[in-house]
Curated annotation (Swiss-Prot):
<dbReference type="InterPro" id="IPR004437">
    <property type="entry name" value="ParB/RepB/Spo0J"/>
</dbReference>
<dbReference type="Pfam" id="PF02195">
    <property type="entry name" value="ParBc"/>
</dbReference>
<dbReference type="InterPro" id="IPR041468">
    <property type="entry name" value="HTH_ParB/Spo0J"/>
</dbReference>
<comment type="function">
    <text>Involved in chromosome partition. Localize to both poles of the predivisional cell following completion of DNA replication. Binds to the DNA origin of replication.</text>
</comment>
<dbReference type="GO" id="GO:0007059">
    <property type="term" value="P:chromosome segregation"/>
</dbReference>
<dbReference type="Pfam" id="PF17762">
    <property type="entry name" value="HTH_ParB"/>
</dbReference>
<dbReference type="GO" id="GO:0005694">
    <property type="term" value="C:chromosome"/>
</dbReference>
<comment type="similarity">
    <text>Belongs to the ParB family.</text>
</comment>
<dbReference type="GO" id="GO:0045881">
    <property type="term" value="P:positive regulation of sporulation resulting in formation of a cellular spore"/>
</dbReference>
<keyword id="KW-0238">DNA-binding</keyword>
<keyword id="KW-0159">Chromosome partition</keyword>
<dbReference type="InterPro" id="IPR050336">
    <property type="entry name" value="Chromosome_partition/occlusion"/>
</dbReference>
<dbReference type="GO" id="GO:0003677">
    <property type="term" value="F:DNA binding"/>
</dbReference>
<dbReference type="InterPro" id="IPR003115">
    <property type="entry name" value="ParB/Sulfiredoxin_dom"/>
</dbReference>
<dbReference type="InterPro" id="IPR036086">
    <property type="entry name" value="ParB/Sulfiredoxin_sf"/>
</dbReference>
<protein>
    <recommendedName>
        <fullName>Probable chromosome-partitioning protein ParB</fullName>
    </recommendedName>
</protein>
Amino acid sequence: MGLNKDRGLSSLISDMDTVYSKELGFDKNQSTMIEIDQISPNPFQPRKNFDQEALDELANSIKEFGLIQPIIVFKKNNKFILIAGERRLRAVKALGKKEILAFIADIDENKLRELALIENIQRENLNPIELANSYKDLMQVHKITQENLAELIHKSRTQITNTLRLLNLDIRTQELIASGKISQGHAKVLVGLDQKDEKMLVDSIIGQKLNVRDTEKIVKKIKNNESLPNQEFEDEIKKLKQILNRFGFDCKNKNNDFVIHLENIDKIKKLIKMLEKL
């Protein structure tokens, strides 16, 4: 197959559609077995995180049913560079296989970075931060606007904008989003806060397992300049709760309220004795 070279982003996307068309309904006469040791990963692969559990599931599926879709590579100096299918390649390699079914595409090496970005965007393989960086890279490389990009990859302008805004968050917050410890729903709420409030809220999301709705309520208070318990206050409340729990007291806290359940006279006397010893 000969893909056209030295064209714009729209042509690259068209080329990837051609590759996927070939991949999903490929002619077995045009696919071939390639030694895995001869394949190098795409150096411009935007995807950095690979879920091990998902890879194990894929490996088990390939072991039982075989590799249904070949990977896509291009040839360089008698070796091959991966274009699409890194998860499949990793899974097959984990099974101890020496070869893998591949489709050899005729693609300009200079377009490898863009193809890797587009491949992952179209397959939705990226976490929110990787996706945001991919959008940013494509816009910079091809000098296009958010509106141009939205039209080319068939996404809404709002979706592009909201995703790119994640790159304004603190690096630590971005890492937590990329690792899945903070959801994209949480991330959207955090955008626009100053660094101090962002850090405080991120710590609360992780420490108190706040859902998105709880997070939205806190952000609303911050933006309305309402007082919020600081992290030190929350930490001390948590310690107090742990101490009381150890002595058999049922207690809970919500916002600035701390409630101790004293269901009988014995519990009241026990608490009084504890306080008198202080």
